[in-house]
Structures are given as structure tokens and as C-alpha cells.
């Protein structure tokens, strides 16, 4: 029988599996955890379980999915959040779980379920909704201006990249954090309405805050590029190694860009080509 069970599935599926596990003859000391992005709903279900459950959420991921997107250093130096009922028994079990996961080299943090969902709602879930909205709006825009997508600069791509994440996973996230997200979206509507009023009233004093944050570099438009994303560790010369390999294959680059870094451990190198092959 298993000592540990990790439910690395979308939130709603994890809840379903918890109920299924309750029907099975598990080891008395089994420790179950999940990797879902919301915690209040699943922790409420866990209160009635006969086995120990610790909520888990590694704050690392990729817009890519499937076995081909595997990354051995994915969790390294990323926050790994645990949620529990703060009892002494659970404290010892969290320590046990940290020992099990120490090979990930993640940074372990404990939060209350509500605190977790508020933080991730603001800094992860809401940005995803906004990114998805931008993608949808751009697709409608393309219907009127078929050439428009050719001129989408790097900033737009960076903002909307997360919208390509697994839709089934995000459906569960949005539904299980529904109340908070509705409040955040309404607050966002207030902010955008305020911007609309400033522009309509030509309120340049208030609009200055927005104007000051508009990019003043990378002016003009960019042609359509074909992008390759490469995970690179942080050490001197690593980008040179990548470009040397490409040069040996006589591949001409249009642009190099580091998309993300995590405390000097790993970055995503965006390599842009003019042609697809």
C-alpha cells in the first residue's frame, strides 16, 4: 500500500479522487496531497476524510502541457505552498511532506486556504482571465483587419502567452475560486471604467499615470516571427552555447529574449526566426 499519494490533476478532479480514496482500504499512515491552484474548496472536503490530507500548490508551471513539456528543474527555487488546519499533527505531516519533496529544491511556504486563494486569485488567476480576454479581442479584431496579427509586438505576446495554458485545468480553477474572482473582475471593471472616463474627459492629469507607463522603446511594428522557447540554466556562456549550436546548423536568428527567470536558476530563452523552417 502507498505511503504517499499525490493528486497531480485539476482541482475538481482531485476532489473527485479524494472521495474515491475514502472508499478504499488505504494504509493507516498514508499522506495524501494535491497540486491544485485553489485550496478553500478542497480543504473543506478534506475535513471529513479519514486519512491525512495536506493541500499543496507548487507555484511553477508552463503554458505548455503533456509529457513532451517535462522539465526536471521546474520547481527549483519556486514557491511550494502547503495549506492545512494548523493542528500539531498536521504540522508534523507537513514536515514529512517537505522531506519527501526536498529533491524539487522548491521554497516551502505555509498559508491558510483563504489567504492562498486570495493571493493566487490576484496574481495568477485574474491575469489569466485578462490575457484570455485580450486573445479573444484580438481574434475579433483580426476578422476586420486580417493583417493585424502580423504586427503583434513582443509585449502583446508576453501578456497573452499564459492564455494558451491547459483549458480544462483553468476551467476548474475559475469555478473553484469563483466568488473571489468575480469580486476581482468587478474591481478591474471599475479601473477600466475610470480609464475610459479619463480619456473621454481628456483628463490629462490623471491619464498621465497611464501614459507614463506606456512603453517608449520598441516603437513601430514587428513582422511575424516563429518563436522557439528553450529552458536554460543560469551560468556564464549558456546563451552563447545555444547560439553556437544554431549557428553550426546555419540558422539565422531575428531576436533573442529572456522571458522569465527564477532567482538565477532557470530562464526561458525566446529565440525568434523569420521563417518556420
Which residues does each PLM region occupy?
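Beta-loop-alpha module in the N-terminal Rossmann-like domain of NAD(P)-dependent dehydrogenases
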Residues: 8-20
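Interdomain hinge/lid region at the active-site interface
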Residues: 144-211
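Rossmann-like NAD(P)(H) cofactor-binding subdomain of soluble oxidoreductases
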Residues: 17-68
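Glycine-rich, N-terminal phosphate-binding loop of Rossmann-like dinucleotide-binding domains
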Residues: 8-10, 36, 84
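An anion/phosphate-binding loop that grips the pyrophosphate of nucleotide cofactors and donors
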Residues: 2
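N-terminal Rossmann-like NAD(P) cofactor-binding module of classical short-chain dehydrogenase/reductase
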Residues: 5-6, 33
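Internal alpha-helical scaffold of NAD(P)-dependent oxidoreductase catalytic cores
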Residues: 74-162
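A conserved regulatory-domain signal marking ACT and ACT-like small-molecule sensing domains
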Residues: 213-277
Amino acid at each position: 500500500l502507498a505511503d504517499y499519494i499525490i493528486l497531480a490533476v485539476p482541482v475538481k478532479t482531485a476532489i473527485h479522487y479524494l472521495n474515491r480514496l475514502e472508499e478504499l482500504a488505504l494504509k493507516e499512515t498514508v499522506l495524501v496531497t494535491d497540486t491544485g491552484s485553489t485550496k478553500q474548496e478542497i480543504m473543506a472536503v478534506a475535513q471529513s476524510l479519514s486519512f491525512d490530507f495536506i493541500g499543496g500548490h507548487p507555484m511553477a508551471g508552463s503554458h505548455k502541457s503533456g509529457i513532451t513539456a517535462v522539465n526536471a528543474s521546474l520547481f527549483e527555487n519556486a514557491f511550494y505552498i502547503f495549506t492545512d488546519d494548523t493542528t500539531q499533527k498536521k504540522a508534523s505531516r507537513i514536515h514529512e511532506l517537505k522531506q519527501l519533496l526536498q529533491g524539487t529544491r522548491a521554497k516551502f511556504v505555509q498559508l491558510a486556504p483563504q489567504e492562498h486563494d486570495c493571493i493566487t486569485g490576484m496574481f495568477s488567476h485574474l491575469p489569466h482571465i485578462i490575457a484570455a480576454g485580450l486573445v479573444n479581442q484580438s481574434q475579433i479584431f483580426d476578422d476586420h483587419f486580417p493583417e493585424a496579427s502580423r504586427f503583434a509586438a513582443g509585449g502583446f505576446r508576453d501578456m497573452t502567452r499564459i492564455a494558451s495554458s491547459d483549458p480544462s485545468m483553468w476551467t476548474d480553477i475559475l469555478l473553484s475560486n469563483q466568488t473571489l474572482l468575480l469580486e476581482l473582475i468587478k474591481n478591474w471593471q471599475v479601473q477600466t471604467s475610470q480609464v475610459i472616463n479619463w480619456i473621454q474627459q481628456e483628463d490629462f492629469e490623471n491619464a498621465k499615470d497611464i501614459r507614463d507607463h506606456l512603453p517608449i522603446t520598441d516603437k513601430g511594428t514587428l513582422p511575424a516571427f516563429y518563436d522557439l522557447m528553450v529552458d536554460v540554466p543560469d551560468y556564464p556562456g549558456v546563451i552563447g552555447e545555444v547560439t553556437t549550436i544554431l549557428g553550426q546548423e546555419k540558422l539565422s536568428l531575428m531576436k533573442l529574449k529572456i522571458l522569465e527567470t527564477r532567482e538565477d536558476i532557470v530562464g526561458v530563452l525566446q529565440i525568434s526566426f523569420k521563417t518556420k523552417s
